[in-house]
Amino acid sequence: MSINEVRYLPECGSTNAYAKEHFEEFGPVGAVYTTNQTAGRGRLGRSWVNAEGKALYYTVAIREPLAQPATLPLLASLAVRHQLQLRYGVDCQIKWPNDLLLNGKKIVGILCESVSYGYQQQGRGILCGIGINLAQPQSYFCLLYTSPS
């Protein structure tokens, strides 16, 4: 599965919301990313606090049918964890169902959502949104993520 299109937005309310609104424009697989997300959210409607220029927010929009869509949050967690370890030597832990922790503090949040599209909303797809804290001071983690959501 290869990505057909990747869009960069200097600022975005929510990459998941943007990907949902523009879902049919992406082709089978597309992505959108930003470093300034002003209305991000997590599971159960929880807010995700923006840290302009200090985090990467992106969403992959998948129209291809997945055999086991419920496994996508775990697969995304494993993939992000592997890349952080491989590229940066960061050894983080997975907190099921959608977080990665470093020294007990949340550094990655993942939100997967289903989306309907097409004629009478009969098509089915999935969005996988990932927020990664990149350059936060220690105080940021102490204030915001003392208890991961």
Which residues make up each language-model segment?
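Acidic (Asp/Glu) carboxylate-rich active-site/surface patches
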Residues: 79-121, 130-131
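Conserved small/polar residues in nucleotide/adenosyl-binding loops
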Residues: 145-149
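Conserved beta-strand-loop-short alpha-helix elements that form
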Residues: 127-135
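Residues at beta-strand starts and edge strands
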Residues: 54-56, 124-128
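Short glycine- and Lys/Arg-enriched binding-loop motifs that mark or flank ligand-binding interfaces
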Residues: 36-41, 49, 95, 100, ...
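Cytochrome P450 core scaffold surrounding the K-helix E-X-X-R motif
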Residues: 136-143
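Basic, gly/Ser/Thr/Pro-rich low-complexity segments located predominantly at protein N termini
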Residues: 45-50, 114, 134-136
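N-terminal lobe of the biotin/lipoate ligase/transferase fold
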Residues: 1-86, 108
